[in-house]
Regions:
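Short structural boundary motif marking the start of a folded domain
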Residues: 1-4
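Short hydrophobic/aromatic beta-strand micro-patches
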Residues: 7-9, 50-52
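An amphipathic, aromatic/His-enriched active-site/gating alpha helix that lines ligand/cofactor pockets
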Residues: 17-36, 52-85
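A short beta-turn/loop motif at secondary-structure boundaries
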Residues: 38-43
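Surface-exposed aromatic
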Residues: 44-48
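Short, low-order "capping/linker" segments at domain edges
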Residues: 86-94
């Protein structure tokens, strides 16, 4: 299962969260099955988002869509966004 990990700094978490919740990328329509928003404990102005997809094609298309969004008005609520596509190798609840 491919996961897109996005990470970036935010000048204001609250303003960024409002933009994220407005869902300009249409997460469900883009194939996102599940996502998590993470914050760094010692740097609350840095966020990471993990988005799970069924296939690599959807993940790659989503990253392209996000690059377009990042080059638009999203610049006001985030700094230096970066996306990577990773594969889950192992996961287990203990």
């Amino acid at each position: 299962m491919p996961v897109v990990r996005i990470e970036h700094a935010v000048p204001s978490f609250e303003k960024w969260k409002l933009a994220f919740d407005s869902d300009p990328a249409d997460r469900k329509g883009s194939g996102v099955r599940r996502y998590q928003v993470l914050r760094v404990r010692d740097d609350p102005k840095y966020v990471m988002i993990d988005l799970e997809f069924d296939n690599i094609g959807e993940a790659e298309a989503f990253v392209q869509k996000m690059q377009g969004i990042w080059n638009g008005p999203a610049k006001a609520v985030m700094q230096n966004p970066r996306a990577r596509i990773v594969d889950v190798v192992e996961g287990k609840e203990v």
